[in-house]
Amino acid sequence: MAELKSFTLADLSQHTTKDSLYLAIHGKVYDCTGFIDEHPGGEEVLIDEAGRDATESFEDVGHSDEARDIMSKLLVGEFKTDSSEKPKAKSPSSSTPRPIPAAEPSDSGSLQYVLALAVVAGCVIWKVLL
C-alpha cells in the first residue's frame, strides 16, 4: 500500500464543499466526496463537519461495522495536528439544539382563582343541601 499523505487542519479546510469534502476521524483523513449522496444521515451532516476533525461527531452518532468498512475505502491520509493551529469553531447548524425560551406570564392565575372559588362554592352548596 502506498504511503498515506499527511494533512494539517489548514489542508483539511480546503476541502469543505460537495465537490471536495474531507473529514478527519480518529487521526485519519477520508475523502467523502463520492459518498455524499449515499450517506444515510444525509449530505448536510457531512457538509457541516467538512474540513475539520469530526471524530467527536462521528462517535456521538455511532456507526455500524459496515460504515467503518466503507470508510476504509475512502481513506486518503493521516491527520497531523499542529499545536499552533486552533481547531475551527463549529458553526451553528440546523441540527444544533436551541434553548427553549422561558414561558411568558399569562392570565392563567385568574383562571386558577375562578376554578378554586368554584370548587369552594360547590363544597359549601353540597354541605348545605346534605
From Swiss-Prot:
List the GO terms this entry assigns under cellular component, sorted alphabetically.
endoplasmic reticulum membrane
Q: Is Cytoplasm one of the keywords UniProt gives this record?
A: no
Looking at the record, the residues that make up the Cytochrome b5 heme-binding domain are 4-80
Mainly resides where? Answer: endoplasmic reticulum
Positions of region (Disordered): 80-107
| Residues reported in the UniProt entry to bind heme | 39, 63
A single GO BP:
sterol biosynthetic process
Has UniProt tagged this entry with the keyword Transport?
A: yes
Q: Which SMART domains match?
A: Cyt-b5
Subcellular location(s) of the protein: Endoplasmic reticulum membrane; Microsome membrane
- What is the recorded function of this protein according to its Swiss-Prot or TrEMBL entry? Membrane bound hemoprotein which function as an electron carrier for several membrane bound oxygenases.
Q: Which family does it belong to?
A: Belongs to the cytochrome b5 family.
Its name, as the record gives it, is Cytochrome b5
Task: State the organism named in the record.
Answer: Mortierella alpina
